From Swiss-Prot:
Native organism: Methanosphaerula palustris (strain ATCC BAA-1556 / DSM 19958 / E1-9c)
Assembly information from the UniProt record: Heterodimer of a small subunit (PriS) and a large subunit (PriL).
Names of required cofactors: Mg(2+); Mn(2+)
Function per UniProt: Catalytic subunit of DNA primase, an RNA polymerase that catalyzes the synthesis of short RNA molecules used as primers for DNA polymerase during DNA replication. The small subunit contains the primase catalytic core and has DNA synthesis activity on its own. Binding to the large subunit stabilizes and modulates the activity, increasing the rate of DNA synthesis while decreasing the length of the DNA fragments, and conferring RNA synthesis capability. The DNA polymerase activity may enable DNA primase to also catalyze primer extension after primer synthesis. May also play a role in DNA repair.
Cellular component aspect of the GO annotation: DNA-directed RNA polymerase complex; primosome complex
Residue positions of the active site: D98, D100, D282
Name the record gives this protein: DNA primase small subunit PriS
Gene: priS
């Protein structure tokens, strides 16, 4: 990044922190803070093990230091500013889920943001409808980058260790499912993982049905434990098997030896389908009881977008490419290395290779993402 570009971004961030009073997490006195600063060097370094006694102290720090990224601990500590983790005195942590589009799909920035929001809504439904968390304890935060964080601030989970959090994220993501326990006679198969599992299985069989039969036979017989003859038998009985899944006793299909072999991790196509049925959350974030997470209302140094806190009711209508933009439309000259398209503020901007004038918000976005530089002699 050129010095002029770095200075431009810092000026924009400075202006933002001068005019905004940040939202701070509950129990500010018990939180550790970490910051990454604008630096011309390539090595990214975080300054952490910091603590603030009051909101105004943090506000002045942001105004003075103007960080590129702002983080605080999901954990609560007796001495959050202690220089080592052992000295901090852990006393609990919020339950955090991280949904990052990079782990879900690849595509345009706009498409990735739309796709990851689907996962947010899926996760919220699981948390509230199946795991019983109250909506008032669930906060959604747009990360300012490619995803969202969901904070569960329920006192009932604060003392949980990594093992308990692992159980929750395993359920949410559908890891280690035992179909024999899920799909049993007399259980409600219309909700939760029983419904999702049967839906995934029916979808997989429907995929086999429309697939070229030679390719379907080759696919099935390549799975460990499935012979060519047994694969052919399953293909011939697909309609009957699917009818059983949709009938009164879907648990009967679990007795089929071929289906048991097909629905294991040895079958990557089934594994992927089942994974997509669950929530595609970043598991290590949830199990980490000392995680640093982005501060809502701060700016993301990799995009220039605001880290936006949301209630559950606000998620549906939220558009990060409009609602997380905090900069204006004054003209700024930038130089792009290649032609690209940017969707921002409800408009689509065609940016050509070379030097041109774009709105300030677009300039910040492009420069933060490393897609353009401030034009020389602007």
């Amino acid at each position: 990044m050129r010095p002029a570009t770095l200075e431009f971004i810092k000026q924009q961030f400075t202006g933002y922190y001068q005019r905004v009073y940040p939202v701070t997490p509950d129990a500010l006195l018990q939180r550790e803070w970490g910051f990454i600063f604008f630096d011309a060097g390539r090595e990214v370094r975080m300054r952490r093990h910091l603590a603030f006694g009051e909101r105004q102290e943090l506000t002045e720090y942001l105004k003075t230091m103007v960080p590129a990224h702002v983080f605080y601990s999901s954990a609560y500590y007796e001495s959050p500013g202690a220089p080592t983790m052992a000295e901090k005195g852990w006393s609990g942590a919020d339950l955090i889920f991280d949904l990052d589009a990079d782990h879900i799909m690849h595509g345009s920035y706009q498409a990735m943001l739309a796709r990851v929001k689907e996962e947010v809504q899926k996760l919220l439904a699981v948390l509230t409808d199946e795991l019983g968390f109250s909506e008032k304890y669930c906060e959604v935060v747009f990360s300012g980058g490619r995803g969202y964080h969901i904070h569960v601030n329920d006192l009932a989970v604060r003392s949980w260790g990594s093992a308990e959090r692992r159980e929750v994220v395993n359920y949410v993501c559908g890891i280690g499912l035992d179909p024999g326990l899920l799909i049993r006679a007399g259980t409600d198969l219309s909700t939760g993982w029983p419904r999702r599992y049967l839906g995934a299985l029916d979808g997989y069989l429907a995929w086999l049905k429309v697939k070229n039969q030679k390719d379907a036979l080759l696919h099935l017989s390549s799975i460990k434990g499935v012979s060519r003859s047994s694969a052919a038998g399953l293909l011939k009985s697909l309609d009957q098997v699917r009818a059983t899944i949709g009938g009164d006793h879907p648990e009967k299909v679990l007795g089929d030896r071929v289906l048991r072999a097909v629905t294991t991790n040895d079958n990557p196509d089934w594994k992927k389908r089942l994974q997509e049925t669950g929530v595609q959350a970043d598991e290590p974030v949830t199990t980490d009881i000392k995680r640093l997470i982005r501060m809502p209302t701060s700016l993301h140094g990799g995009s220039g977008l605001r880290v936006v806190p949301l209630t559950i009711s606000e998620v549906q209508e939220f558009d990060p490419l409009i609602d997380a933009v905090v900069f204006g439309d004054r003209d700024v000259q930038v130089t792009a290395e290649k032609t690209l398209t940017v969707s921002l503020l409800g408009n689509t901007y065609e940016v050509s290779a070379g030097t041109q004038t774009v709105p300030e918000a677009v300039a910040v976005f492009l420069c933060c993402r490393g897609l353009a530089e401030i034009a020389e002699g602007r």
